[in-house]
Amino acid sequence: MRKRNAGIKPSQRFAELRALRQAGKTRASTYESKENEELYDNVSEEEYRKIVRQRLDEDDFVVDDNGAGYVDNGYDEWDQSHYSDEDDENEKGSSGRKRKKSKNVLAEPNQQIGAFFKANAIQPASRIANRKNNEKEDEFMAEILGSIDQDIPERLSTKKGNRSHTTSNAKRRSQKAASSISTTNVVSSDPKKYIPETVPSTPQPASSLPIPSSPPAALETEENVDSQPMELDEPELPVGSDAPIIDVEESIAMKPLMSHDQVDDTASLSKATISQQPLSPMTPLSSELDVSAFSEINSKIKNVDVPASSYSSPISKVSPSDVTEEDGSLFFFWMDYTEMYGSLCLFGKVYDKATKQYVSCFLKVDGIMRSLYFLPRPSSSSVSEDSIAAQTKDVYDEVANLLSKRGVKEWKSRVSKYKYAFELEDVPRTADYLEVIYSYSYPALPTDLTGSSFSHVFGTNTALFEQFVLSRRVMGPCWLKIQQPNFDAVKNASWCRVEIGCSSPQNISVSFEKNEITSKTPPMTVMSLAFRTLINKEQNKQEVVMISARIFENVDIEKGLPANDMPSYSFSLIRPLKQIFPNGFEKLARQHKSSIFCERSEVSLLNNFLNKVRTYDPDVYFGHDFEMCYSVLLSRLKERKIHNWSSIGRLRRSEWPRSFNRSSQQFVEKQIIAGRLMCDLSNDFGRSMIKAQSWSLSEIVLKELDIKRQDINQEKALQSWTDTAHGLLDYLVHCEIDTFFIAAVAFKIQMLQLSKNLTNIAGNSWARTLTGTRAERNEYILLHEFKKNGYIVPDKQQSIRRHAEAFGAEDGLQEESLGKKKDKYKGGLVFEPQKGLYETCILVMDFNSLYPSIIQEYNICFTTVDRSPSNSDSDDQIPDTPSASANQGIFPRLIANLVERRRQIKGLLKDNSATPTQRLQWDIQQQALKLTANSMYGCLGYTKSRFYARPLAVLITYKGREALMNTKELADQMGLQVIYGDTDSVMLNTNVTDKNHALRIGNEFKEKVNERYSKLEIDIDNVYQRMLLHAKKKYAALQLDSQGKPNLDVKGLDMKRREFCTLAKEASKFCLDQILSGELTETVIENIHSYLMDFSEKMRNGKFPANKFIIFNRLGKNPEDYPNGKTMPFVQVALKKKARGENVRVGDVIPFIIAGSDADGHPADRAYSPQEIMNTNSTLVIDYNYYLSHQILPPIERVIAPIEGTNRARLAECLGLDARKYYSHETSESSAFQRYESTLTDDQCFINVSPLLLKCPSCNATSFSLRSVKSLKETLYANTVECDCGYEYSDFTIILQFSSQLRDFINLYYEGILVCDDSSCGNRTRQMSVYGKRCCNKSCRGSVHFEYNDEQLYNQIKFLLKAVQTTTGATRNGIIRCNAINKNISRIMNKNAREFVDMGLIFSS
């Protein structure tokens, strides 16, 4: 940029000064003010807006800018700062003055032009003006360079010149943004203090952006380079730029913008000669991170070049003529919705005929009316046409007055006849209602509103979306036909390519036409995301440091292709995890096969990510733990005040929605993302499709893809691995590979297909189905069915709890989090199991879909069952079943329709001529139909459902118990033994060993049962060769498949629970295999004992990997809310994770490992995350004794319990545990008769006492651990009691230590801690159940007892007295010592009531 008067030569100025001096004048006296030229045109507001519109109509002035942000919005950038010379002068000035800087506030789009000319100048952020002396600065720079690479040569001093002005304004703005980031004292905010002046051996271009297919020309001549020495700037990345991704099979060498020679020849940085030496090789990454594992996977991913369409402007609109039909209508496939100011906003896709692509579309539907139904009060006079008319007139007048008071100016009404069949007792089955409709822009009426002329009003809180789909009969995502679309009604309201307005829902109808456009679901654009965050310890907030995305375009969800067969392209965004990137990282990033964008700050990273989202315009997000990551992302967008933050969804927003509490915060987050579906592998819906323990990404990938994903310690990675260029790149690639894993799992389990089919059946929202709301699906399918048949449907109950659950967890978790609920009615029948080992064939006879079949069998429906108060005297009264002549109810007809549709589809699956795509579609459809039909009963018994009907649920379960009991009686009549039965199945002991013979018996039994019913049907579910039946819902058996091959089938045992580690499950499985092997009992017991001894030896020698010791527990509530959380290991681990800033929420499965020993405290204090244990630098040692006694022994003991020949003490001995601790337990359990205590020896009496310790005051070592009376006597009877260090214990010290230990035991007794005798429960509490000894845990059937009872305390005190009361054989000093101890301890024993027996109290009666 030229300076003013740059054309005047210095010689001319000197001549002018000499002339003035000779004349005796000065320049100030001769200065004349010149009239400046007009810099701006004075125009009116209307003229300025016209100019802006003309600019918008013009083409972009930058062609193919790779999405770098050169988009003209038509307005002048009055409020944006640009680089100028003054910026550098301000930075370099030595003045210590601090300037006040104003914030860079973006102008509102609709501001008047005068608002753009405010005097608030936008200036750079304030900087610290203090300078250090040269010596300190040299030391500081040496430290910085040394931290980057130890082999960089010593810096030579160079003359500092002015900064080059060839950098673009965009780059300067980026530099300012980077310099404004809060930094620590390691790197100063002054750029000159941290930019190295030494030239690296490998020069880096000005941009670390991956090179586009047509790279700009390299600098070749000296005119292109500033002659002044310049400081090295860190390479910048233009926001929003893209680059082609290299195909795996075609490796293309990436060329830098300037070669090494060109830099040496044209860009000399100083007149002084600088010796350049190659940098030392990067430090290899820790061996803990197996780079080859995911590098091999990354090389096999089918990456493609970024298509040219991705470089086009993401906001380009589509012409209306390209999306409409000849008659002016439009086909629109809707996917998601949101509600805004009384209008329904639908998001979906339309077909662009010009590009022959499906593009995103936004449809704003106005004119949807709220429908209210006023029920007139019953008249006491005789019913006549005149009285009915008068009554209706009264209701009309009262409603008109009511609406007028509430500001409703426009409304319509009519009298309509509707039916009602639900739980309000005073609502007649059929009645005339005053139907009132008015716009949703007016406020809603209260739900409990009544009047003098009407008793009820229905529909006051009906949601806008519900009103639309019910009135237009829209059943989930489908093609809609829009008549009279208005393309001018909506402008820039969304981020979609097409925006349409529709004035009335009457212009929208479901399209049943099958043409080229509407014959299938449009292809989707899927973006799979993975995030990495770190904790800002100063602010205690999570910050985003890395985002990786993988884009799959034109995904046909109906074909069900695996991720490997679909082309994709990926990009990653990363910012420095510390102050700067490791030296050489940006060069590695440019050479990486997929695009890596190195951003300078979190702000630029988030801006670039949103720019990518707008460019690719994804329809669906894939993620793992995405709901939590999405919440963090939104918080960072809001915290950093990112412009266009709403583009994470598809609705443009200028203000953040307000949230008042946690539940509404979740609601707000879902509203922001509206328009783009969220598929989360770890939410309720994802978990319902994947059987796993912890639902971690590694476990899911191993189970579904059979690929071992390497878990990494995030904390360690951020601290050490990312210090080197290669380490940071490997860390990034690990995140990048996760995007493929997430997408591959989601595509394999058919997440999109199944959720769409479920939504089409229920008629609700696709996005809501993806959150796992099963209860809402049941509600919507009933709403559609009853509304279609002319019924008034129940209103949705409005309460704080219901609103909190609107976007919360699924039913089971809600119940758990809200507290223990008492049984609402009697459930299914469960027979008492005939425990034991069965060597003959066992048949499992199962009723197919018992409850749906009962609903059809007995015609149970809201419309058929009489639930009036006169017919039900109490809550437990069973309603009568409808008569056989009653018309089929809506509920059974709906279920019959679902069952019949599934039967037809299963018939299609048998067609061998069907294509794989057809078979996949049919299979998904039959799964969706089965899930829907089987879950319909749940809405009747779910108290928070709109269709909750307790009498119907009671009747259905009663008929289920009746059917099971009748089945048992029939088996008894046929001479078959029913060994167990549960709700919808019975187990029959056939007393034969041949499978075919057992099947013949089962078929005969099946025929006799099925002939009793028309809809109920029983069938043979399983044939077990051998079976070990433990308890209710707990058994193991060898299941015979169709070829007669046995497979182990386990239900309810400990090896199926996540609370037991892998080693416990392996040991239990071995024991089960032995028991079910058919060998002799003696051989089985001998093999188990040998295995356990070998198992214990291997564990104590560290032969098992640490990951087999991981225990899982699920959080039922927030970790802070557990009253006994201090004694629960998983709660303590969860609290530690929260303290580190990690995300922990209700429902998470917490993994942990117990380390240390009993001497280190309670197991809860010794619980650590697996990463802490498996860290190569960790000094923690796994507590093998804890695992053997609490994880291995209890499940094995329960497995072997029905087998004779061993006991708990013997099993403990095989595991290397102290068998003496288990003898008393075995005796108390096995025998009702016990010996008198007076007949027991000292060893038998004091087998369970704790040892008494003597700790040396001199060396702090435990000198004596006295475990028996014999050892006590040997120590105390001696002449002196000495420590190994030579310290001699005084009698006073011994008495004090013994007394202190006994007081600890007394305190332990008075704590009154109760423990459950069921080792699988492990409950430990001070709370006592109202049922006495019953365990407080809901799912436990064990009994509680005192952890430390009065007998144990008595024996502990008696243990010491036994040794000191008699002094036979003691030395003189020993006698004195024992007498002193006896005197003090006897005082304690005299206070123990167990010592004395009150004979008078015994014989007083």
UniProtKB/Swiss-Prot annotation:
CDD domains per the UniProt record, alphabetical: DNA_polB_alpha_exo, POLBc_alpha
Interaction with mcl1: annotated span: 118-634
PANTHER family, per database record: DNA POLYMERASE ALPHA CATALYTIC SUBUNIT
Family affiliation: Belongs to the DNA polymerase type-B family.
Zinc finger (CysA-type): 1256-1285
Function: Catalytic subunit of the DNA polymerase alpha complex (also known as the alpha DNA polymerase-primase complex) which plays an essential role in the initiation of DNA synthesis. During the S phase of the cell cycle, the DNA polymerase alpha complex (composed of a catalytic subunit pol1, an accessory subunit spb70/pol12 and two primase subunits, the catalytic subunit spp1/pri1 and the regulatory subunit spp2/pri2) is recruited to DNA at the replicative forks.
Source organism: Schizosaccharomyces pombe (strain 972 / ATCC 24843) (Fission yeast)
Acidic residues bias (residue ranges): 220-236
Motif (CysB motif): 1316-1340
Biological processes per GO annotation: DNA repair; DNA replication initiation; gene conversion at mating-type locus; lagging strand elongation; leading strand elongation; mitotic DNA replication initiation; nuclear cell cycle DNA replication initiation; nuclear DNA replication
Reaction equations catalysed: DNA(n) + a 2'-deoxyribonucleoside 5'-triphosphate = DNA(n+1) + diphosphate
Name by which UniProt lists this protein: DNA polymerase alpha catalytic subunit
Keyword Ion transport appears in the UniProt entry: no
Subunit structure: Component of the alpha DNA polymerase complex (also known as the alpha DNA polymerase-primase complex) consisting of four subunits: the catalytic subunit pol1, the accessoryy subunit spb70/pol12, and the primase complex subunits spp1/pri1 and spp2/pri2 respectively. Interacts with mcl1 and mcm10.
